[in-house]
């Protein structure tokens, strides 16, 4: 089977896979019900590298819910403290205190409260209308829409943006990055977290290779 083109640059993927994993779950969310165990089957994950831009990626289609993937149910006390320290450092380093910030892939908007405490004026962008409704009911400044579809966000252009464990789920990360650029000022600063391929391989964290994750990044990519 001919590999699909690179989801970032459109170049050819390596004929030889970087990693092949068999018997893997079909998705990291929406697990089968007990009544479905008898017919549920694992899938093979084929990971290849682009011969052009070097991005390592899943050679396959995205899961059906990629627009509103949920990376965590909620922020634990420890996670919240960790993120708050990061956001405070981000604000100080780039002189962003009091500035507007867009959280891309905000889920229910829990990070907006962290961003507010860190001194930002935050807005959360989320594709799931259900998550947006929950966020708004908690008093959070939420906008509904998917970053890959040219959505307009009230309050743009923003002076900063964050995207936490979201870009790796998108079938066209380059489109999302260009759209983020269109929604932010020319000198905007960004804070992005994505899977670190070098770390995953060094620590043998193969559980991070799931159908939901379409891209695996290095410092170069």
Predicted regions and their residues:
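Short, conserved clusters of charged catalytic residues that mark active-site
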Residues: 1, 85, 175
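A generic "functional-site adjacency" signal
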Residues: 3, 44-47, 84, 129, ...
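Conserved SAM-binding loop
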Residues: 88-204, 214-221
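Conserved histidines in hydrophobic membrane contexts and catalytic metal-binding motifs
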Residues: 208
């Amino acid at each position: 089977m001919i590999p699909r083109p690179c989801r970032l640059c459109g170049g050819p993927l390596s004929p030889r896979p970087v990693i092949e994993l068999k018997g893997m779950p079909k998705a990291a969310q929406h697990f089968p019900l007990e009544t479905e165990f008898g017919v549920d089957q694992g899938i093979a994950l084929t990971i290849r590298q682009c011969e052009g831009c070097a991005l390592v990626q899943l050679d396959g289609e995205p899961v059906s819910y990629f627009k509103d993937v949920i990376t965590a149910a909620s922020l634990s006390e420890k996670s919240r403290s960790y993120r708050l320290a990061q956001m405070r450092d981000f604000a100080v380093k780039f002189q962003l205190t009091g500035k507007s910030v867009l959280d891309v892939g905000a889920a229910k908007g829990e990070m907006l409260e962290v961003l507010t405490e860190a001194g930002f004026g935050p807005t959360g962008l989320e594709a799931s209308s259900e998550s947006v409704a929950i966020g708004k009911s908690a008093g959070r400044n939420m906008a509904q829409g998917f970053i890959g579809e040219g959505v307009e966000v009230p309050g743009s252009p923003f002076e900063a943006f964050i995207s936490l464990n979201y870009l790796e789920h998108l079938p066209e990360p380059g489109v999302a990055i260009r759209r983020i650029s269109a929604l932010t000022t020319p000198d905007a600063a960004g804070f992005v977290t994505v899977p670190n391929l070098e770390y995953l391989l060094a620590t043998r964290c193969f559980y991070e290779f799931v159908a939901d994750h379409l891209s695996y990044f290095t410092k170069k990519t």
